[in-house]
Regions:
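Non-catalytic C-terminal accessory domains or segments of carbohydrate-active enzymes
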Residues: 263-265, 362, 755, 761-921
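Catalytic grooves of carbohydrate-active enzymes
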Residues: 223-236, 480-510, 529, 610-613, ...
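Metal-dependent polysaccharide deacetylase catalytic core of the NodB/CE4 family, i.e.
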Residues: 76-78, 91-103, 356, 363-373, ...
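Catalytic domains of cell-wall/extracellular-matrix polysaccharide-remodeling enzymes
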Residues: 133-155, 161, 172-183, 608-685, ...
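C-terminal domain-boundary segment and adjacent tail
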Residues: 256-273, 310-317, 476-493, 523, ...
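A glycine-centered loop/beta-turn motif at secondary-structure junctions
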Residues: 275-278, 306, 400, 409-495
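Helical hinge/lid and interdomain linker segments adjacent to catalytic or ligand-binding clefts
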Residues: 29-43, 47-50, 289-370
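A glycine-rich, often tryptophan-bearing local segment used as a flexible ligand/cofactor-contacting loop or short
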Residues: 340-412
């Protein structure tokens, strides 16, 4: 365990019907880019501290164990040059490391001050001590060995006295336990069932005699010292099932298992297994001006995110993630819009990941040269371009999904695959072609059988159609397991509803009867915001509203209208920036210019040079200081213009404690009923993240405000088509201030509001939704035997279950309030940031739906207690409530209606504290 490794953890399916036998789990990760959120579901997470600058602030309340070699040191360690020669006894020939003389008090003091103390400051609350038996290589006599053991024990006790809250894990060190007075949590050892013989470069079974000796040591440690025991075994990276079987055997001895490869550079397996959700999305760019406009982003995000995956995006000509991705990533998707984009280094890297068993999906064009040296690794065989149009000889049901296969077929990549399960098989003359298939390594769909225009040769928004069902293909190609899927569309069984307004047109003058000569903002305030108490996020553009902006003579009036809007209890504040950049990348690249290659870059504020911090944080501070009262603060930035902010703008928002939203174009309608117009929930940009608006505004539905001006009412079509057959999106009423400038446009907005009021929805603020999207990216899902364990930030409160998974058993569950089987899906309601349950269901009472958030939930022997807080009159339903009474403040609540064992309740209040359901059974 001395090497720097890229291990992480977890994917053991264990015995399918068995409950986990261990209450604790361990994980070891010594690689770069430490996934703290995933490690946090483990009781004993161990990391290599040199791979990070410390434990991130958000995780400093949790215990992470830093790897520390107490017996020897590599010359590459930063502190090595400060060691005195007399502190070293000799060398370890296997590793080239130097062995400490721990009988030296000066060395012990040095290690405490120079090694342990900095780690404690970095947030580590535990230490994993390795190389505790290295002294045996140089200490040959019993007296010498006892001297070194006593020195080791003295060092550990010294660390424990210096940091009394620290906890420790030993790698072996059995003989030290009688000598230490430190709080040891666990003892680990390698190779209980299978080991790696480095000299022979092979895996080998552990002899029964060796296993029994180690089990005896483990048993003695548990009985005498009440510590956990951990066994670390080794298997080849591609042998996941073998790893699961070994882990299952280890757990049968009451020993915590960890099974990985000898290099420890992949996610291992334990009885508690995290299901990886990250997927590497590799794009080759496009003809568009920005990578964010490539097909991989426009079309590729939704099928991945809807199935619970979290894309990490890289261009094919950039550096790929280091190490073995097996278990760390759910798979790799390579989406290319033209041929011959990959180079030799990328192909070699892709082959390496394929050999390690990482599922790979190739979309658009082959990710390796079909006649190159790596084609054979993927089973590709080049075929001559057909002389006559090939005929279809076999077709998967998922092909021809939104657009029938053309009668005259052209092949972008004339290939056959010898290892494939064909999804589309063609024949021309003597040759067979398979342009779409799943394979043992993943799968592929090549153009024109992935996405195709309804008008051949024409490109344009709304013309493209999926030729293959993207959900089905991604699921099968990436070999995704059936797992609970974090869902941002729903809470407590109801589809979310929120509204937000971009401030464009705030100073414009309205044409609406009764408001001629008054601003659009005034019309919106009086006719919409005061009439509909729906949670709404309202923004302003500082450069238009402030006295130092473009309209100083109107500023007093505009600021007062904004104050009146923000004073409404159902309105939260957002900034729509300072100068409303129209093209963010160009505006930032040319800060002093007003026009760029795409047109005007921003509003013409005199003397201003574009600065992303001023745009975002500065405008939010203006709102806080001039337009808000009481405890209200600006919550968000709503991106302006092309809604493609730069990473620097996103960083400014995050560092300014502002959420962000806007971008992408979900505009599916009955005239364009295609999933190519259902976009993702957001996009990562380096270390930053842009949250997309779920729906689009009236500008799109009115043909960029050229008419028909009543066109926004068609957003109701979008709402319906993103609800059935799948709930892809919440209901998001998104508009500009100028929608209130024309009678037809205003009436369309009122129509949309009235429709939303008539639906059984769950109102929230846009900021609530943005937090759910961010939580989606880091929520951790683990399986333990046949039970599930979830951990997140507590913002996202819904999991969607595939048909293959049973509903939860509620007795004995943690963090589960109930569930709802609805048309678009089966939704599990979380009541906290952590949840744990086994499959059920059981005929016990449960929360079936609510239009408010759970602020407290506690299951009791004969019912449960709960509190709800929402934004409108409460509506909720309780299942299996026969023979139960719902009490509040000493009285009982009467259901307004009953459907079998489902009882529906209403209250004119927006929140109720300490509701108590008591049942006689």
């Amino acid at each position: 365990m001395r090497t720097f490794v890229t291990i992480l953890f977890v994917l053991l399916w264990g015995s399918a019907g068995a409950q986990s036998r261990l209450d604790q789990a361990a994980a070891f990760y010594y690689g770069p880019d430490i996934p703290w959120h995933m490690l946090s579901v483990y009781d004993f997470p161990v990391v290599e501290p040199d791979q990070a600058s410390g434990v991130p602030d958000r995780y400093r309340s949790e215990r992470f164990y830093a790897y520390v070699s107490l017996g020897e040191v590599l010359a590459s360690r930063p502190f090595f040059k400060s060691l005195k020669p007399e502190w070293l006894l000799g060398k370890n020939p296997d590793w080239g490391s130097h062995i400490f003389d721990l009988s030296s008090p000066d060395l012990r003091d040095f290690l405490v001050e120079q090694v342990v103390a900095p780690l404690w400051k970095q947030g580590y609350q535990g230490f994993f001590f390795d190389t505790l038996d290295s002294y045996q290589l140089v200490a040959k006599t019993p007296e010498q060995r006892q001297h070194q053991r006593e020195g080791l024990a003295a060092l550990i006790n010294q660390i424990a006295q210096r940091y009394p809250e620290a906890r420790f894990i030993f790698n072996r060190g059995f003989e030290l336990m009688p000598l230490v007075e430190a709080p040891v949590d666990a003892i680990a050892a390698e190779s209980l069932y299978q080991r790696w013989e480095a000299g022979k470069q092979r895996y080998a079974a552990v002899p029964e005699e060796d296993r029994q000796w180690l089990l005896g040591q483990f048993s003695a440690m548990r009985e005498q010292y009440q510590v956990a025991t951990i066994a670390i075994d080794y298997t080849p990276p591609g042998q996941r099932q073998q790893a699961r079987e070994i882990a299952d055997k280890i757990a049968g001895h009451d020993v915590i298992p960890w099974v990985t490869n000898p290099e420890l550079d992949m996610f291992g397996l334990g009885e508690r297994e995290v299901l990886p959700r990250k997927v590497l999305l590799v794009h080759g760019g496009s003809d568009e001006r920005l990578w964010e406009l490539s097909d991989s982003i426009r079309y590729g995000l939704m099928p991945l995110q809807f199935q619970g995956l979290v894309p990490e995006i890289r261009a094919i000509n950039t550096t790929m993630p280091a190490g073995n991705l097996q278990g760390r990533y759910a798979g790799i998707v390579v989406w290319l819009e033209q041929e011959e984009l990959s180079d030799a280094d990328f192909e070699a890297w892709l082959v390496e990941q394929k050999e390690a068993g990482v599922p790979i999906a190739m979309l658009g064009y082959p990710a390796v040269d079909p006649v190159g040296p790596n084609a054979q690794a993927f089973g590709f065989e080049s075929r001559p371009t057909p002389l006559s149009p090939p005929a279809i000889t076999g077709q998967h049901p998922a092909m021809g999904f939104e657009l029938a296969l053309p009668k005259l077929i052209e092949l972008s990549s004339p290939l056959h695959n010898v290892s494939a399960q064909p999804w589309l098989e063609l024949r021309s003359g003597e040759h067979t072609y398979t342009p779409a298939a799943t394979t043992p390594w993943g799968g592929y769909v090549f153009q024109p059988f992935m996405i195709r225009s309804v008008l051949p040769g024409e490109k344009g928004e709304g013309l493209d159609r999926w030729v293959v069902n993207p959900l089905t293909f991604i699921r099968e190609a990436l070999q995704l397991p059936a797992m609970p899927i974090p869902d941002v569309t729903t809470e407590n069984g109801r589809r979310l509803l929120f509204a937000h307004m971009d401030a464009d047109g705030f100073p414009s003058l309205a044409e609406v009867k009764g408001y001629q000569g008054q601003t659009d903002a005034r019309v919106l305030l009086e006719e919409v915001l005061k009439r509909f108490e729906l949670p709404t996020t309202i923004s302003v553009i500082e450069g238009e509203v402030a006295p130092h902006g473009l309209y100083p003579k109107m500023s007093a009036e505009l600021e007062q209208i904004a104050r009146d809007m923000f004073a409404l209890p159902h309105v939260e504040a957002a900034t729509h920036t300072y100068s409303h950049p129209f093209f963010w990348y160009d505006a930032q690249r040319m800060p002093g210019q007003l026009y760029g290659p795409e047109g005007q870059l921003r509003l013409p504020i005199p003397g201003y040079r574009m600065d992303p911090v001023r745009e975002v944080v500065g405008s939010a501070e203006y709102i806080n200081e001039n337009l808000l009262s009481g405890d209200k603060r600006t919550e968000m930035v709503l991106w302006s213009g092309d809604t493609i902010p730069t990473p620097e703008a996103l960083a400014a928002a995050r560092q300014g404690n502002l959420l962000n939203m806007n971008g992408s174009d979900t505009i599916i309608t009955e005239s364009a009923p295609t999933w190519t117009l259902v976009k993702g929930i957001g996009v990562p940009k380096g270390d930053e993240y842009q949250v997309y608006a779920p729906n689009q505004n009236e500008n799109i539905y009115t043909r960029e405000w050229t008419g028909p001006f009543y066109g926004f009412e068609r957003v109701i079509e979008t709402f319906k088509l993103t609800e059935t057959p799948h709930r892809f999106k919440p209901v998001n009423i998104y508009y500009h201030t100028y929608i209130a400038s024309k009678t037809a446009a205003l009436e369309s907005l009122l129509t949309v509001y009235r429709w939303a009021q008539s639906q059984p929805l769950h109102p929230v603020f846009a900021s609530d939704y943005a937090r759910k999207v961010l939580d989606f990216n880091t929520i951790v899902i683990a399986r333990e035997g046949n039970s599930w364990r979830i951990k997140g930030e507590g913002q996202l409160r819904t999991l969607r279950l595939p048909d293959a998974l049973a509903l939860p058993s509620l007795p004995g569950s943690k963090g589960i309030a109930g569930y709802r089987e609805d048309g678009p899906g089966r939704y599990v309601h979380l009541s906290a940031n952590e949840a744990h349950w086994q499959p059920g269901p059981d005929p016990v009472p449960y929360l079936q739906q609510a239009n408010a958030r759970l602020t407290m939930f506690a299951r009791e022997e004969k019912g449960f207690r709960f509190s709800l807080a929402g934004h409108t009159d409460l509506e909720f339903a309780i299942g299996n409530a026969g023979g139960c009474t719902l009490n509040h403040n000493g009285g009982s609540l009467t259901p307004v209606r009953r459907e079998g064992t489902l009882y529906h309740y209403r209250s004119a209040k927006h929140g109720l504290e300490e509701l108590r359901l008591h049942c006689s059974h």
